[in-house]
Each structure stands twice: as C-alpha cells, then as structure tokens.
A protein has these predicted regions:
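Short amphipathic alpha-helical segment within the helicase RecA-like ATPase core
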Residues: 1-137, 141-144
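Alpha-helical metal-binding/catalytic segments enriched in His/Glu/Asp
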Residues: 84, 138-140, 153-178
Length: 178
C-alpha cells in the first residue's frame, strides 16, 4: 500500500529536531541527475531555513555522493583535484596538489608503481587549515585510486565492477574538509 502526503506539520521548539527531520528527507531525496535530460528535482517545499551546520553537512554529503557516482571517464586524478579545488573554502583551507615529479621526490614509490598501468598522471592532495591558532593534531587520510589510475591488470575479474569505488576514501576525506 502506498501513501501520499501533501503536508507535514512538525510541532517542536527544538531546532535540532527540525534540522534532523529535514536532513533525513533531503538525504533520501538525493537524485544525481547531471546526465539526465529530464531531471527530477525534489518535490518538497519548505518554508524554513536549515541551520548553517546542517546545510553544510548536506552539501558535503551530496558532494561525496556526486564524486563516487561519476563515471571513471569524468573522475580521474586531475579532474578529482580540480573539482575539489572548486569546492573547498579557500579562506579556511590550504590545498597543495602534488604532481608526479613531486610524488617521486617525496618517495611515494608504491603509488608510482601502481600508476605505471595508467595513461593518466597521479595526483596527491594535501590540505592544511589556514590561520589556525590552535595546534590540533588531526590527520585525515583517504585513498583515492581512481579507476584507470593503474593496477587494472592485477585485479581479479570478479572485483572489477567494484574498482570504481576505490576512490571513495579520498572522496570522504575531501567531503569532511569541505
């Protein structure tokens, strides 16, 4: 049996409850439609503002979903780095992108060995917080092996369809920093 809901009234004085409720609706309603001619947008209409914290959370999660949904001819090391640069808050975060020459210099030889099987150059992204007055020791590391950045011939055929997700660790890291 299907139900149709035209309006929802929420009686709460707690903004957090409202934010969590709307957050659930917006996450459920995510549709990646970049390549659809007739994209379906959300049918929900709201007459309130989501807090900045939850709006930022939703935007970060949707960015993560977009990154892992894109096909491998769209997301590869260089395009991943460019898309990341366009999304981060440049006032709060420094982003340094290391190319193959720099990767060799700092000795990331395993990355270079895997990358020999690819026609695309490797990229390593390094983030740091700008103007931080606190000395906080937090490190996020996310593996971002994009499909066709090497190693395809050493993967068993049974795992090939999941190779696209090998970059999800880096996508999560970027989304946290975003």
């Amino acid at each position: 049996m299907k139900y149709s809901i035209s309006e929802i009234f929420i009686n709460t004085s707690n903004k957090l409850d409202l934010d969590l409720f709307v957050y659930g609706f917006l996450q459920k309603d995510f549709i990646y439609s970049n390549y659809k001619k007739n994209s379906q947008n959300s049918k929900y209409k709201t007459n309130f503002k989501l807090s900045k914290k939850f709006l930022s959370l939703i935007n970060s999660i949707n960015f993560l979903k977009e990154l892992v949904t894109e096909p491998s001819n769209i997301i590869y090391p260089t395009s991943f780095a460019k898309r990341t640069q366009s999304q981060i808050n440049k006032k709060a975060v420094n982003l340094v992108t290391h190319d193959e020459k720099r990767i060799k210099k700092i000795g990331l030889n395993c990355l270079l060995a895997v990358n020999q099987g690819s026609k695309r150059d490797p990229i390593v992204m390094e983030f740091s917080k700008k103007n931080s007055k606190k000395n906080v020791d937090i490190l996020f590391v996310g593996k971002g092996v994009c499909f066709d950045s090497g190693g395809i011939s050493i993967k068993p055929s049974g795992g090939m369809e999941d190779m696209k997700w090998d970059m999800a660790g880096a996508a999560v890291t970027v989304s946290i920093i975003k």
